């Protein structure tokens, strides 16, 4: 019988952590984080990392596994997640892959494309253009040659804009076409996806604002000060491009005052949620069996528990 893996995906501030922990109280699960920020050690406040007590209540994987000085890619995630899912099944437990990094979910489901390697000369040209014109201008260039790719990227996301321009220029194809040319081996387990979606975007936005203010009150600025003192960091590292840290970095460097930093942090988090929901709409059309739940419903944890139980039961019946 093919084993199953539960998936819980949703935008930032949609209640994924609380729902995952509630599920752990009724099912023998282990949580595999699907979050490109939670992998970094010592970045706790700005990533809304599960607390020590929450992590003690249920095994968590792919949290605190790399230094903020290092990079962690979708390829790393797919390799690690497949290994962990196999190990969790071997222990007789159920993997729950929970998070909001939609590219990681897609990489797991579809495999990874055979993309061209980094080209040092082309990267140098792109970086020189960015230094002269700014990354928003390069984002606009990307929008002209590959509007779909540009729509998925923040205009200040230097790392991803650089890579997108590089791939499009090296291949002569839109990014989506390059990603479609992939070798995806059949997965040795069934994926049972649950997606959290807000019925009212304004309520999610209010939650995002409240949560960013809570992060500031909890010491996000001091956390980044400590990170800069402990590690050799710069603003271009993937860890420091994470929403919240990027805006506080500019504040600490004197580029923005406190109110501007707060405004930018909230706005960037809302933009992140918008991109996550764009991914989820695409999943809705391409992922048979995906269950959508309103993340604003007062009984969300019960609804997630019920949906998970139904998916697991259906999967068991389908296997016989």
Swiss-Prot record:
Q: Its quaternary structure?
A: Monomer.
- What is the organism of origin for this protein? Aromatoleum aromaticum (strain DSM 19018 / LMG 30748 / EbN1)
> Among its keywords, does the record have Transferase?
yes
GO MF entry, a single one: ATP binding
| Protein name (record) | tRNA dimethylallyltransferase
Instruction: Tell me the organism's taxonomic lineage.
Output: Bacteria, Pseudomonadati, Pseudomonadota, Betaproteobacteria, Rhodocyclales
Recorded catalytic reaction(s): these are: adenosine(37) in tRNA + dimethylallyl diphosphate = N(6)-dimethylallyladenosine(37) in tRNA + diphosphate
Could you say which cofactors this protein requires? Mg(2+)
Record flagged with keyword Mitochondrion: no
| Job of this protein | Catalyzes the transfer of a dimethylallyl group onto the adenine at position 37 in tRNAs that read codons beginning with uridine, leading to the formation of N6-(dimethylallyl)adenosine (i(6)A).
Which GO biological process categories is it annotated with? tRNA modification
């Amino acid at each position: 019988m093919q084993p199953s893996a539960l998936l819980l995906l949703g935008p930032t501030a949609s209640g994924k952590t609380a729902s995952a922990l509630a599920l752990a109280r009724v099912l023998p699960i282990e949580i595999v984080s699907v979050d490109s920020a939670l992998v970094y050690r010592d970045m706790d406040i700005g990533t809304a990392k599960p607390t020590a007590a929450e992590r003690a209540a249920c095994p968590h994987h792919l949290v605190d596994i790399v230094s903020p000085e290092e990079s962690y890619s979708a390829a790393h995630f797919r390799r690690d997640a497949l290994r962990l899912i196999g190990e969790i099944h071997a222990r007789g437990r159920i993997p729950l892959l929970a998070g909001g990094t939609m590219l990681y979910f897609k990489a797991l489901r579809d495999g990874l494309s055979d993309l061209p390697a980094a080209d040092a000369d082309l990267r140098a040209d792109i970086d020189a253009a960015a230094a002269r014109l700014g990354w928003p201008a390069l984002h606009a260039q990307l929008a002209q040659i590959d509007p779909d790719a540009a729509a998925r990227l923040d205009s200040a996301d230097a790392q991803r804009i650089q890579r997108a321009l590089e791939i499009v220029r090296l291949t002569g194809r839109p990014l989506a076409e390059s990603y479609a040319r992939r070798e995806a081996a059949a997965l040795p387990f069934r994926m049972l996806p649950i997606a959290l979606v807000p019925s009212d975007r304004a309520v999610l936005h209010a939650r995002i604002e409240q949560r960013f203010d809570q992060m500031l009150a909890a010491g996000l600025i001091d956390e980044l000060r400590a990170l800069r003192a402990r590690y050799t960091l710069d603003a271009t590292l993937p860890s420091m491009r994470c929403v919240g840290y990027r805006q506080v970095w500019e504040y600490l460097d004197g580029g923005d005052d406190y109110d501007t930093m707060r405004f930018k942090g909230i706005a960037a988090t809302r933009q992140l949620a918008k991109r996550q929901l764009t991914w989820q709409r695409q999943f809705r059309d391409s992922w048979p069996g995906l269950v959508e739940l309103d993340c604003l419903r007062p009984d969300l944890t019960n609804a997630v528990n019920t949906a998970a139980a139904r998916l697991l039961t259906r999967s068991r019946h389908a296997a016989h």
